[in-house]
């Protein structure tokens, strides 16, 4: 990538979010209410090769959001800021993104339909959690990065190139949207409908915390009962060899 391309991605992805947030805050601070939903990504926690500009912009968004949230808490403001971290989505992005890959670009599987992201964003707007992770793959990437970042380096160095391409050579002369929007309505879905998932069990659990807590308690009780019974059985065997 050229330096001006890095600048453009940063201006659109990071500064675009910052300027939009500042505009919303001007109204929300006056009323002392409102929810700002930042659209993040698993890449805000773990960068991958071939997307360094985008990953850096998403991580900058996360840093900006954390600072802003703390400032609002300090002000005792009732304006809340949440960030929804998304997995790979089946959007038209991969048909218009500037790419120098030898084959056509694709999102790193598993791929989800954009409706899954929409459900998460609406829920975050209504409930304003600090963060909301969408998809087990997002949770896995964030957790593994925290526990074993070096392992992630090695894994991505081996797998991330092929994971971001699919069959068919890329057309180096096709139009892209780096410097200007493309004409026409391209819809919300990309070309991966046959592979994309239209639901996320992980998101359902994340947005139904009472059910998750109840299941965890039930599992703990069951484990305790099993352990107690096993202990009594072992005691009987010792007492009556």
Name each model-derived stretch.
Residues 2, 46-53:
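Active-site loop immediately N-terminal to the catalytic Tyr-X3-Lys motif
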Residues 4-11:
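Active-site Tyr-X3-Lys motif and surrounding loop/helix of classical short-chain dehydrogenase/reductase
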Residues 21, 57:
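Active-site helix of classical SDR
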Residues 23-32:
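A short helix-coil junction within the Rossmann-fold of NAD(P)-dependent oxidoreductases
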Residues 41:
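Residue(s) in the substrate-gating loop at a strand-loop-helix junction
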Residues 71-168:
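SDR active-site lid
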Residues 205-232:
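Hydrophobic alpha-helical topogenic segments used for membrane insertion/localization
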């Amino acid at each position: 990538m050229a330096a001006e391309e890095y600048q453009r991605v940063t201006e659109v992805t990071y500064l675009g979010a910052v300027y939009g947030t500042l505009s919303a805050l001007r109204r929300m601070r006056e009323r002392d209410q409102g929810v700002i939903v930042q659209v993040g990504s698993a890449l805000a926690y773990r960068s991958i090769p071939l997307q360094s500009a985008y990953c850096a912009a998403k991580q900058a968004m996360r840093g900006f959001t954390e600072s802003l949230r703390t400032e609002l808490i300090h002000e005792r403001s009732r304006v809340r800021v949440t960030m929804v971290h998304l997995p790979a989505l089946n959007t038209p992005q991969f048909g218009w993104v500037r790419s120098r890959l030898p084959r056509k670009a694709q999102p790193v599987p598993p791929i989800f339909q954009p409706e899954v992201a929409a459900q998460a964003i609406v829920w975050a707007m209504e409930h304003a959690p600090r963060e909301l992770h969408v998809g087990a793959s997002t949770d896995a990437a964030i957790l593994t990065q925290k526990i074993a970042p070096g392992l992630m380096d090695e894994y991505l160095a081996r797998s991330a190139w092929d994971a971001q391409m699919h069959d068919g050579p890329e057309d180096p002369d096709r139009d892209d949207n780096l410097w200007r929007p493309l004409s026409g309505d391209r819809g919300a879905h990309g070309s991966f409908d046959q592979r994309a998932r239209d639901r996320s069990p992980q998101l359902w659990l994340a947005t139904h915390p009472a059910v998750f807590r109840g299941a965890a308690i039930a599992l703990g009780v069951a484990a305790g009962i099993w352990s107690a019974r096993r202990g009594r059985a072992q005691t009987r065997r010792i007492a009556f060899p």
